[in-house]
Amino acid sequence: MRGQVRVPDGERSLLSPFPPVLVPIWVTGARTIVGLWKHWFSDRQPTFVEFYGTTVYGRRNMAFERGRTLKQVIYGHLFECITNRDGVDDEIQAFANACGISDVDEIDRISIDGGDVTTLRSHAEFVGKLPLSFFDCDNQTDYTGDFPTNAVASSTAALQRCCVHEIHSGFQNLEPDYTLREAVAQNSNSPEWFRTTSQSELFERLLNANDLEGAWMCLNSPAWTLANARQAITDLAARANDTAFSALATTWVNLPFADDEMF
């Protein structure tokens, strides 16, 4: 999908900072960011999320897995657009064509049946690989991906492979629910990036210990200033000595946001 593709009900202007684990694809009207979620220095599988950073509703610091494949994300967005616009218009059709989606009429039919985007669970692209957001927070046992579920919170070893943005209880009555995150933070056995008051100091200790995965998870947790985070990812790239990661770090460091902004 090329950069010039017009995303219905989406925009390309990045209005607020985001953690380097996220590679943005588009921004929604609510200023959430849809994109690739890729963990470095970890065996976690890349996936696709909607990231709630600084939104029109305030700062949320929450990531939701919206698709385990790029096509799932596109199908989900098509469903939402068709529902909001009450059918397939020229812009939606052009977007589907540009993304190689040939069954937009089927998505239209599914949307007419009512329900939310989770009604796509019967579509061939989703069968056997549902994203975590298709499951209720209290019923995730059938999920087969590796985005953190609620069960992860009870495993210190599993939490070592997670960043803070991934641990939450979703929304309750349209408000963010941080019950799970708060419980993890109160557990003295949890990784330090869930508990620290200074991510930058913790990052330095983890990097000095050559714990690249821990340093990365720390860097992708809330309460960083961009100035500190820019220095941190530069130091991490130097230690990792990986060409692809260095390219990501350089791009992220040069994003057009002020040093005193937070993410």
Regions found by a protein language model. Name each.
Residues D90-D116:
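Hydrophobic, aromatic-enriched interface-forming segments
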Residues V5, W37, T55, R60, ...:
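Compositionally biased, intrinsically disordered low-complexity regions
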Residues D43-A98:
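Compact, glycine/acidic-enriched structural inserts
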